[in-house]
Amino acid sequence: EWCGSNADCGDGQCCTGGSFNRHCQSLADDGTPCQKPNDYNEYKFGCPCKEGLICSPINYCQKK
């Protein structure tokens, strides 16, 4: 589903992608690729991790 910002997506999702190809995607799960949370809530490659997980230095979710 196309989105302009995270507000266009449901709970547990973020808006990710390039400027013309943005879509809602589920928050990243343990062991899956992620993008670290940022102040602007702008994500190009993936979503932040689900609650209780952190995005590791190699951009994969893992338990805290």
UniProtKB/Swiss-Prot annotation:
Stated role: Non-toxic to mice and insects.
UniProt family annotation: Belongs to the u-CNTX family.
Recorded superkingdom: Eukaryota
Assigned keywords, A-Z: Disulfide bond, Secreted
Keyword Disulfide bond among UniProt keywords: yes
Bridged cysteine pairs (disulfide): 3-15, 9-24, 14-47, 34-55, 49-61
Tissues expressing the protein: Expressed by the venom gland.
Protein name: U9-ctenitoxin-Pr1a
GO cellular component, as recorded: extracellular region
Lineage: Eukaryota, Metazoa, Ecdysozoa, Arthropoda, Chelicerata
Disulfide bond found in the keyword field: yes
Main location class: secreted
Source organism: Phoneutria reidyi (Brazilian Amazonian armed spider)
Subcellular location: Secreted
